[in-house]
UniProtKB/Swiss-Prot annotation:
Binding site for ATP: K202, E324, G350, G351, D352, T353
Keyword Nucleus in annotation: no
Full protein name: Phosphoglycerate kinase
The keyword Transferase is assigned to this record: yes
Source organism: Herminiimonas arsenicoxydans
Chief place where the protein resides: cytoplasm
Subcellular location(s) per record: Cytoplasm
UniProt entry keywords in alphabetical sequence: ATP-binding, Cytoplasm, Glycolysis, Kinase, Nucleotide-binding, Transferase
EC number: 2.7.2.3
Primary gene name: pgk
Family: Belongs to the phosphoglycerate kinase family.
One Gene Ontology cellular component: cytosol
Pathway: Carbohydrate degradation; glycolysis; pyruvate from D-glyceraldehyde 3-phosphate: step 2/5
Length: 397
């Protein structure tokens, strides 16, 4: 992928005295009183802001927060708590500016936070008139919000069409570099772990990866559907019988080119889905009609861990069992530690995956952890991300 980078502009001393507009992803969780409960995204946005300030730029930053109604600003929509947290992290004042579309006063070395961009009429529809107005505020546009890269909106796409210079910030660039390395130039063997409750929500990803990977490890309800496709009984486990044909087609397609979808040889079952359910390990042939499969078994986990240990590249999206309940967590824990200990390059993403990484304290052992939920999945699906595509177009025009 070819796109301009903020770091390149800084290296060429092209930001001094310039007005820089940064689209960040500051959409953080808050409690009922508006207090920020988790600030990872704010901390992740700091390098781009700090780099632009140190390069002598006048910096404007904006983000969406929640789902405001366009044209109707409410107190719950405000970025005020984020301005305060940014100020603490940067060690300098961060003023919050409302009604900013028609003009912003900011001097070199200063940073202002522009109020929730999704309150502006036309933001979500990528309105051209709005995009041109916002582009006129700056000399350089920086997209540093991978989490919204799959959306074509005025501050993610439209502005990039019209700004004098449009580039990727360090967070977006690192994300694209890592995902490109994993999917476009992977060291082999390439192993993907795709897990979740439904095949239907990840069918496109499964089909796309089936063309590329050497081993496609499936988990959760997705694995149950593949077990049905392999002719195994799954009791009363969550599965999608109408997608058994698709699962079988994916298995056949991969087998033809010498790749595989490893089907579990043993599973962890229970009679009910609850935190206190009694877990029983069974060979797959012994699953009964009243069993619910809630994790892969230890033999399966060891087989898969060995495949992961030999991988050159690993893409991880989803825990393979109900890891929130400890008695059904061994599969996810075993694979998580195998990924952490592998010498291969690993990329992980998706909310449940991030929770598993946190639970097993392996964040520093994953090659790259993706910050974008929907954008990460669409990248895995092979879809074009509008906010990235426009940066590529601008780089070549």
């Amino acid at each position: 992928m070819q796109f301009k980078r903020l770091s390149d502009l800084i290296a060429r001393n092209e930001l001094k005295g310039k007005r820089v507009f940064i689209r960040a992803d500051l959409n953080v969780p808050q409690d009922g009183k508006g207090n920020i409960t988790e600030d990872t995204r704010i901390r992740a946005s700091v390098p781009a802001i700090r780099q632009a300030l140190q390069a002598g730029a006048a910096v404007m930053v904006t983000s969406h927060l929640g789902r405001p109604v366009e044209g109707e600003f409410k107190p719950a929509d405000t970025l005020a708590p984020i301005a305060q947290r940014l100020s603490e992290l940067l060690g300098q004042p961060v003023a919050l500016k409302q009604d900013w579309v028609d003009g912003v006063d900011v001097a070199p070395g200063q940073v202002v936070l522009l109020e929730n961009c999704r309150v502006n009429k036309g933001e979500k529809k990528n309105d051209d008139v709005l995009a041109k107005k916002i582009a006129a505020l700056c000399d350089v546009y920086v997209n540093d919000a991978f989490g919204t890269a799959h959306r074509a909106e005025a501050t993610t796409h439209g502005i990039a069409k019209y700004a004098t210079v449009a580039c990727a910030g360090p967070l977006l660039a690192a994300e694209l570099d890592a995902l490109g390395k994993a999917l476009h130039q992977p060291a082999s063997p390439l192993v993907a772990i795709v897990a979740g409750s439904k095949v239907s929500t990840k069918l496109t990803i499964l089909k796309t990866l089936a063309d590329k990977v050497d081993n496609l490890i499936v988990g959760g309800g997705i694995a149950n559907t593949f077990m049905l496709a392999a002719g195994l009984k799954i009791g009363k486990s969550l599965a999608e019988a109408d997608l058994v044909g698709d699962a079988r087609a994916i298995m056949d397609m991969m087998a033809k080119r010498g790749a595989s979808v490893p089907i579990p040889v043993d599973v962890v079952c229970a009679k009910e889905f609850s935190p206190t359910a009694i877990a029983t390990v069974k060979d797959v042939a012994d699953v009964t009609d009243d069993d619910m499969i809630l994790d892969i078994g230890p033999k399966t986990a060891d087989i898969l861990a060995k495949q992961i240990s030999q991988a050159g590249t690993i893409v991880w999206n989803g825990p393979v069992g109900v890891f929130e309940f400890d008695q059904f967590a061994n599969g996810t824990k075993t694979l998580a530690h195998a990924i952490a200990e592998s010498s291969g390059f690993s990329v992980a993403g998706g909310g449940d995956t991030l929770a598993a990484i946190a639970k097993y304290d392996i964040a520093d052992k994953i090659g790259y952890i993706s910050t974008g939920g929907g954008a990460f999945l669409e990248f895995l699906e092979g879809k074009t991300l509008p906010a990235v595509e426009i940066l590529e177009q601008r780089a070549t025009s």
